[in-house]
Amino acid sequence: DALSPDLTAQKIFKKISKSEVPIKQILLNQKLIAGIGNIYASEILFDSKISPLTLGKDLEISLIMKLIKSIRKILKKAIKYGGSSIRDYRSTDGTLGNFQSNFKVYNKEGKKIGGDKVKKIVQYGRSTFYCPKLQNNK
């Protein structure tokens, strides 16, 4: 589970250190980390300054630690705001989520952020939004 205290950088590093798969796709793998969807994956990677194109094998333990911190930060914030209502999502009580008003990159193609522009690419059939200059794994 993405918010579990059992999720550690060492465990993730061990599972992805030889992976030729981009980190965005790794985040969407529910068998590895349950609870991260497409929208949150883009937001998490932006928050951690990691390119969605980075292969699992190229992530150092220090970047995985940043990634886990961002996973917890973004998902807790999303829960606080009731999730994201992009189309017709409603919570169990029928209310709309409001986290979409906090998106930094998702669905913001062309928006200027810190001297960069949000770019949209498609990975494994899913839209990915990121800032190439800002998400440089540093």
Where are these regions (language model features)?
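Basic, nucleic-acid-binding surfaces and adjacent catalytic neighborhoods in DNA/RNA-processing proteins
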Residues: K11-K138
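Compact, glycine/acidic-enriched structural inserts
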Residues: D1-D6
